[in-house]
Protein backbone atom coordinates (compact mmCIF):
# COMPACT_ATOMS: atom_id res chain seq x y z
CA UNK A 1 0.00 0.00 0.00
CA UNK A 2 1.29 3.44 -0.93
CA UNK A 3 -0.19 6.82 0.02
CA UNK A 4 1.15 9.92 -1.70
CA UNK A 5 1.55 13.25 0.09
CA UNK A 6 0.93 11.76 3.54
CA UNK A 7 1.87 14.92 5.44
CA UNK A 8 -0.46 14.60 8.42
CA UNK A 9 -1.92 11.68 10.32
CA UNK A 10 -4.30 11.01 13.19
CA UNK A 11 -5.67 7.81 14.69
CA UNK A 12 -9.28 6.84 15.37
CA UNK A 13 -9.66 3.41 16.96
CA UNK A 14 -8.08 0.98 14.45
CA UNK A 15 -8.07 3.53 11.63
CA UNK A 16 -5.39 5.94 10.49
CA UNK A 17 -6.63 9.23 9.05
CA UNK A 18 -4.04 10.37 6.53
CA UNK A 19 -3.80 13.35 4.18
CA UNK A 20 -3.24 12.31 0.59
CA UNK A 21 -3.14 13.46 -3.04
CA UNK A 22 -4.04 11.68 -6.25
CA UNK A 23 -4.59 12.84 -9.85
CA UNK A 24 -4.06 16.50 -8.92
CA UNK A 25 -6.67 16.42 -6.15
CA UNK A 26 -6.12 16.19 -2.39
CA UNK A 27 -7.96 15.28 0.78
CA UNK A 28 -7.87 12.47 3.32
CA UNK A 29 -7.91 8.68 3.36
CA UNK A 30 -8.97 6.15 5.98
CA UNK A 31 -6.55 3.24 6.39
CA UNK A 32 -7.25 0.06 8.34
CA UNK A 33 -4.23 -0.46 10.60
CA UNK A 34 -4.64 -4.23 10.77
CA UNK A 35 -5.11 -4.99 7.08
CA UNK A 36 -3.14 -1.99 5.76
CA UNK A 37 -5.89 -1.29 3.24
CA UNK A 38 -7.55 1.96 2.26
CA UNK A 39 -11.15 1.95 3.49
CA UNK A 40 -12.22 5.20 1.87
CA UNK A 41 -10.98 8.56 0.64
CA UNK A 42 -12.40 11.93 -0.33
CA UNK A 43 -10.31 14.17 -2.59
CA UNK A 44 -11.96 17.57 -3.08
CA UNK A 45 -9.08 19.99 -2.46
CA UNK A 46 -6.46 21.41 -4.79
CA UNK A 47 -3.60 21.04 -2.31
CA UNK A 48 -2.99 18.72 0.60
CA UNK A 49 -4.33 19.72 4.03
CA UNK A 50 -1.68 20.75 6.56
CA UNK A 51 -3.65 19.65 9.63
CA UNK A 52 -5.93 16.76 10.55
CA UNK A 53 -7.63 15.99 13.85
CA UNK A 54 -10.54 13.86 14.98
CA UNK A 55 -12.98 14.18 17.87
CA UNK A 56 -15.08 11.08 18.36
CA UNK A 57 -16.12 10.11 14.83
CA UNK A 58 -15.77 13.61 13.37
CA UNK A 59 -12.66 14.67 11.44
CA UNK A 60 -11.44 18.23 10.90
CA UNK A 61 -8.80 19.33 8.39
CA UNK A 62 -7.26 22.73 7.64
CA UNK A 63 -5.85 23.67 4.24
CA UNK A 64 -3.15 26.35 4.15
CA UNK A 65 -3.25 27.04 0.40
CA UNK A 66 -6.91 26.42 -0.42
CA UNK A 67 -8.05 28.35 2.63
CA UNK A 68 -10.71 25.82 3.61
CA UNK A 69 -11.66 23.76 6.63
CA UNK A 70 -13.28 20.40 5.95
CA UNK A 71 -15.53 18.55 8.39
CA UNK A 72 -16.12 14.83 7.89
CA UNK A 73 -17.80 12.04 9.81
CA UNK A 74 -16.77 8.39 9.86
CA UNK A 75 -19.85 6.25 9.23
CA UNK A 76 -19.40 2.49 8.93
CA UNK A 77 -15.71 2.97 8.11
CA UNK A 78 -16.58 5.38 5.29
CA UNK A 79 -16.13 9.13 5.03
CA UNK A 80 -19.12 11.46 4.93
CA UNK A 81 -18.51 15.14 4.12
CA UNK A 82 -20.41 17.26 6.64
CA UNK A 83 -19.22 20.77 5.76
CA UNK A 84 -16.69 22.67 3.71
CA UNK A 85 -15.92 26.02 5.32
CA UNK A 86 -14.45 28.26 2.63
CA UNK A 87 -12.48 31.11 4.17
CA UNK A 88 -10.23 32.57 1.48
CA UNK A 89 -7.70 31.29 -1.03
CA UNK A 90 -4.23 31.30 0.57
CA UNK A 91 -5.70 32.19 3.97
CA UNK A 92 -3.05 30.07 5.64
CA UNK A 93 -5.53 27.98 7.65
CA UNK A 94 -3.26 25.96 9.90
CA UNK A 95 -5.25 24.26 12.65
CA UNK A 96 -8.73 23.48 13.97
CA UNK A 97 -9.26 23.77 17.74
CA UNK A 98 -12.49 22.57 19.34
CA UNK A 99 -14.04 24.83 21.98
CA UNK A 100 -17.56 24.18 23.29
CA UNK A 101 -19.73 24.25 20.15
CA UNK A 102 -17.18 26.25 18.17
CA UNK A 103 -14.29 25.64 15.79
CA UNK A 104 -11.30 27.94 16.22
CA UNK A 105 -9.18 28.33 13.08
CA UNK A 106 -5.86 30.24 13.04
CA UNK A 107 -5.50 31.85 9.59
CA UNK A 108 -1.79 32.55 9.39
CA UNK A 109 -1.70 34.61 6.20
CA UNK A 110 -4.71 36.72 7.22
CA UNK A 111 -3.27 37.50 10.67
CA UNK A 112 -6.57 36.34 12.11
CA UNK A 113 -8.13 33.63 14.22
CA UNK A 114 -11.66 32.88 13.06
CA UNK A 115 -14.33 31.20 15.16
CA UNK A 116 -17.23 29.23 13.68
CA UNK A 117 -20.46 28.04 15.33
CA UNK A 118 -20.94 24.31 14.85
CA UNK A 119 -24.61 24.48 15.88
CA UNK A 120 -25.41 27.22 13.38
CA UNK A 121 -24.16 25.60 10.16
CA UNK A 122 -20.57 26.64 10.96
CA UNK A 123 -21.31 30.36 10.58
CA UNK A 124 -18.49 32.79 11.36
CA UNK A 125 -19.26 34.34 14.76
CA UNK A 126 -15.97 35.93 15.87
CA UNK A 127 -12.67 37.13 14.42
CA UNK A 128 -9.54 37.85 16.44
CA UNK A 129 -7.25 40.19 14.51
CA UNK A 130 -3.49 40.48 14.99
CA UNK A 131 -0.92 43.00 13.72
CA UNK A 132 0.37 42.47 10.18
CA UNK A 133 2.99 39.73 9.82
CA UNK A 134 2.10 38.06 13.12
CA UNK A 135 0.97 34.81 11.50
CA UNK A 136 -1.08 33.02 14.19
CA UNK A 137 -0.40 29.31 13.70
CA UNK A 138 -1.39 26.93 16.51
CA UNK A 139 -3.19 27.23 19.85
CA UNK A 140 -4.13 25.17 22.91
CA UNK A 141 -6.58 25.61 25.79
CA UNK A 142 -5.98 24.87 29.43
CA UNK A 143 -8.13 22.18 31.06
CA UNK A 144 -11.11 24.38 31.96
CA UNK A 145 -11.01 26.48 28.78
CA UNK A 146 -10.41 29.68 30.75
CA UNK A 147 -7.18 30.42 28.86
CA UNK A 148 -6.22 30.09 25.21
CA UNK A 149 -2.49 29.98 24.43
CA UNK A 150 -1.38 30.77 20.89
CA UNK A 151 1.93 30.73 19.03
CA UNK A 152 2.58 32.84 15.93
CA UNK A 153 4.76 31.66 13.07
CA UNK A 154 5.93 34.91 11.48
CA UNK A 155 6.58 37.01 14.60
CA UNK A 156 7.47 34.06 16.88
CA UNK A 157 5.33 35.30 19.73
CA UNK A 158 3.37 33.58 22.50
CA UNK A 159 -0.07 34.93 23.41
CA UNK A 160 -2.09 34.23 26.55
CA UNK A 161 -5.82 35.04 26.29
CA UNK A 162 -8.38 34.85 29.08
CA UNK A 163 -11.56 33.31 27.71
CA UNK A 164 -15.17 33.90 28.72
CA UNK A 165 -17.50 32.34 26.16
CA UNK A 166 -16.57 34.31 23.00
CA UNK A 167 -14.66 37.06 24.78
CA UNK A 168 -10.90 36.62 24.31
CA UNK A 169 -8.85 39.09 26.38
CA UNK A 170 -5.10 39.31 25.82
CA UNK A 171 -3.21 39.08 29.11
CA UNK A 172 0.38 38.40 28.11
CA UNK A 173 2.53 38.44 24.99
CA UNK A 174 6.06 37.04 24.99
CA UNK A 175 8.73 37.32 22.31
CA UNK A 176 10.26 33.91 21.70
CA UNK A 177 13.14 35.51 19.78
CA UNK A 178 14.64 39.01 19.68
CA UNK A 179 13.10 41.09 16.89
CA UNK A 180 16.45 41.29 15.08
CA UNK A 181 16.71 37.47 15.03
CA UNK A 182 13.42 36.73 13.23
CA UNK A 183 14.82 36.39 9.69
CA UNK A 184 14.52 32.84 8.37
CA UNK A 185 12.83 31.63 11.56
CA UNK A 186 9.27 30.48 12.21
CA UNK A 187 7.67 29.11 15.33
CA UNK A 188 5.61 25.97 14.83
CA UNK A 189 4.07 23.63 17.42
CA UNK A 190 2.73 24.30 20.91
CA UNK A 191 1.85 21.80 23.67
CA UNK A 192 0.58 22.13 27.23
CA UNK A 193 1.11 19.72 30.13
CA UNK A 194 -1.84 17.93 31.69
CA UNK A 195 -1.44 19.89 34.93
CA UNK A 196 -1.54 23.16 32.94
CA UNK A 197 1.75 24.34 34.46
CA UNK A 198 4.01 24.39 31.41
CA UNK A 199 3.92 25.21 27.70
CA UNK A 200 6.41 23.93 25.12
CA UNK A 201 7.00 25.57 21.72
CA UNK A 202 9.24 24.72 18.76
CA UNK A 203 10.86 27.33 16.52
CA UNK A 204 12.32 26.46 13.13
CA UNK A 205 15.33 28.29 11.74
CA UNK A 206 16.52 29.04 15.26
CA UNK A 207 15.99 25.30 15.94
CA UNK A 208 14.80 25.97 19.46
CA UNK A 209 12.56 24.37 22.04
CA UNK A 210 11.11 26.94 24.44
CA UNK A 211 9.66 26.12 27.86
CA UNK A 212 7.16 28.56 29.39
CA UNK A 213 5.99 28.39 32.99
CA UNK A 214 2.33 29.32 33.48
CA UNK A 215 2.56 29.68 37.25
CA UNK A 216 1.51 33.16 38.41
CA UNK A 217 2.05 34.67 34.96
CA UNK A 218 3.62 33.20 31.79
CA UNK A 219 7.40 33.47 31.58
CA UNK A 220 10.13 31.79 29.56
CA UNK A 221 12.20 29.52 31.79
CA UNK A 222 14.30 27.63 29.23
CA UNK A 223 15.37 27.61 25.58
CA UNK A 224 17.50 24.80 24.16
CA UNK A 225 18.51 23.39 20.78
CA UNK A 226 15.99 20.97 19.27
CA UNK A 227 18.65 18.38 18.46
CA UNK A 228 18.35 18.93 14.72
CA UNK A 229 17.22 21.39 12.05
CA UNK A 230 13.64 22.57 11.42
CA UNK A 231 11.65 21.21 14.41
CA UNK A 232 8.23 21.25 12.76
CA UNK A 233 6.34 19.16 15.31
CA UNK A 234 6.74 17.48 18.68
CA UNK A 235 4.74 15.65 21.32
CA UNK A 236 4.91 14.89 25.02
CA UNK A 237 4.86 11.24 26.05
CA UNK A 238 1.75 9.99 27.82
CA UNK A 239 3.50 10.17 31.21
CA UNK A 240 5.06 13.53 30.24
CA UNK A 241 8.54 12.35 31.15
CA UNK A 242 9.75 12.75 27.56
CA UNK A 243 9.48 15.17 24.66
CA UNK A 244 9.86 13.80 21.12
CA UNK A 245 10.56 16.30 18.34
CA UNK A 246 10.85 15.67 14.59
CA UNK A 247 13.45 17.77 12.76
CA UNK A 248 12.54 17.83 9.08
CA UNK A 249 15.76 19.13 7.52
CA UNK A 250 18.04 16.70 9.35
CA UNK A 251 15.68 13.74 8.87
CA UNK A 252 15.62 12.79 12.53
CA UNK A 253 13.61 12.53 15.73
CA UNK A 254 15.19 13.71 18.96
CA UNK A 255 14.01 12.39 22.33
CA UNK A 256 14.47 14.55 25.43
CA UNK A 257 14.00 13.73 29.10
CA UNK A 258 11.78 16.14 31.04
CA UNK A 259 11.76 17.14 34.70
CA UNK A 260 8.07 17.10 35.63
CA UNK A 261 8.63 19.14 38.79
CA UNK A 262 10.01 22.25 37.09
CA UNK A 263 9.00 21.56 33.47
CA UNK A 264 12.53 21.90 32.13
CA UNK A 265 14.16 19.75 29.49
CA UNK A 266 16.89 17.76 31.23
CA UNK A 267 18.88 16.25 28.38
CA UNK A 268 18.87 14.75 24.90
CA UNK A 269 18.71 10.98 25.32
CA UNK A 270 18.34 9.63 21.79
CA UNK A 271 18.24 10.55 18.09
CA UNK A 272 16.68 8.32 15.43
CA UNK A 273 16.64 8.68 11.67
CA UNK A 274 13.19 9.61 10.32
CA UNK A 275 13.18 10.82 6.69
CA UNK A 276 11.52 14.20 6.07
CA UNK A 277 9.38 14.03 9.22
CA UNK A 278 6.87 16.86 9.62
CA UNK A 279 4.31 15.44 12.07
CA UNK A 280 4.16 13.08 15.03
CA UNK A 281 1.41 11.41 17.08
CA UNK A 282 1.27 8.72 19.75
Features from the language model and the residues they span:
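Beta-rich, blade/repeat-based domains predominating
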Residues: 3-13, 45-56, 87-100, 130-145, ...
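Loop-centered beta-sheet repeat module
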Residues: 103-156
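A short beta-strand motif characteristic of beta-propeller blades
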Residues: 1-2, 37-43, 80-87, 123-130, ...
Amino acid sequence: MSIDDAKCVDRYENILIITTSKNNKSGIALVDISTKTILDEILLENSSPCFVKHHDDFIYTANYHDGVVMVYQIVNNKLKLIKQISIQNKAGCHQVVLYKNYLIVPCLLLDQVRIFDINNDYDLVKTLTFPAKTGPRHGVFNHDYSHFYLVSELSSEFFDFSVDNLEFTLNTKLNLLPKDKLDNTSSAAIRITKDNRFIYISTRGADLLTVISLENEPKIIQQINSGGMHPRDFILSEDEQYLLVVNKDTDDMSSFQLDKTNGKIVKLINTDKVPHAIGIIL
